[in-house]
Amino acid sequence: LYVIVATGNIYEDVVQAQAAARQGADIIAVIRTTGQSLLDYVPYGATTEGFGGTFATQENFRIMRKALDEVGEEVGRYIRLCNYCSGLCMPEIAVMGALEGLDVMLNDALYGILFRDINMQRTLVDQYMSRVINGFAGVIINTGEDNYLTTADAVEEAHTVLASDLINEQLALLAGLPEEQMGLGHAFEMDPMLENGFLYELAQAQ
């Protein structure tokens, strides 16, 4: 069970994350504040204000990892922590995540190219370096194909998701990321009323 917290205040995120873990959550994802992907630096320290999410900082990572370890002891299982390693500081955030014991990173340059107008060469180089780091640190990466379908029809544009999955797989392999650490993005976003919709989704996922 994958649960998202995003209050903007890391200390309030901790309360929500621990409550979610007690209710059965396996992975806690802390969404980043709006616009952090366009910051050319990583903010410092614990943060208590964000917009639509919480700043990704090394201290925030440490606070949340500690909180999940505490609740993990309480419930008798390990709780994974996920954050976002995309935008203009992919390698820096990858290093922070490796140092602070994160388990999963959303790690995809293509989203930044398509939706944030980030320079393609720069961000693909950044992605390569961040995936080398994630691979070495044992961090699982997720890619962001589900984002493409927020502005397009999931049937008509299914080929774009598939193409991106194949590109992301090859870029991850080139960076030395083991296959067991690859989480290629897919989301069930076809209209539930579509005839054979589930078969289409299943076929694409396979």
How should each PLM-predicted stretch be described?
Residues 1-206:
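Anaerobic metallocofactor- and corrinoid-dependent redox/one-carbon enzyme cores
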